[in-house]
């Protein structure tokens, strides 16, 4: 269990009489001691909502997902551990709310934890709750603001003697607590599934190992046929702070991994071979897009529409014509009738609001951005709907690739 010392928030409340002095040195910080007491907790997604106190019944986000990352290139976190992604309150049918309370959107998570006497928690998060871009604080802020604010039992009114940002501490503390009980790396290793540059595994092998440890199936996510994420699903009897987490079946979207040939890439770099029969071939970039053409989207094993002039993914109608202009020998820029194109705020967009064009390249015939040929979206467009394309995976569930169809 993580150890803590009283922070300024606790000391201030003790001195002003809001907390007894004896309580500020209480070593057990696994859950808030002044959160709402629930006499007869009901299990979320099993009991029907009929007006229960949502301080004791997680609603509407009653399906809790503890999500973990395996980032191998670039390597993120310890070589023998997965890292934390977040704790997400899904609806029982797989949908979800996001950014539920603008008044509780914080940008100082580290300071909040330290001021609450949880420097121990911050230290652990700095090792195991990692952002692949290197900005851990930004990831923590994103997870709280997008997901934490949507957990009903973390509302400030659910505390008998609330101190500022107490619910933020509870969110990160509970996420770490659940993560520590789900050692994905060790669970897979116990089943003979270990990172390797040569071995591959089946989806059934991976699912069997993780489901046995979790006591319920899990959601397994891949990127370019390689293990990338695991989602553990729970329902909760009572509040997030003090309730019982019960393993549950996955909701909503299932795995995107192939049935066989799944790679589990080591985080540490491959050691060079001392002897080789033939020299290795360097990776080369493809011929840059040029002239005028369409940006064709492929996803889920087939062609799925194209990109229209403002940079959105569209499945119906006419594809936009883009101009590819040479930037260097290996790179080029893109422009539509609306204007130049770039990733702004991680989202692909074209228009007069874009101030500087992005440089792209080609790998294996696919559009490449910063070395990646896989892009992401929240959903595949249908009918007249359009979808935003993102450069990083984050929590975007659809993988896609973009190719060029030259127009003459």
Curated annotation (Swiss-Prot):
The keyword Nuclease applies. Belongs to the RNase T2 family. One of its GO terms (molecular function) is RNA binding. Disulfide bonds join 38-56, 45-92, 55-158, 100-150, 222-257. Keywords: Cytoplasm, Disulfide bond, Endonuclease, Glycoprotein, Hydrolase, Lyase, Nuclease, Signal, Vacuole. This is Ribonuclease T2-like. Glycans are attached at residues 108, 173, 372. Residues 1-25 form the signal peptide. Residues 268-292 are annotated as: Disordered.
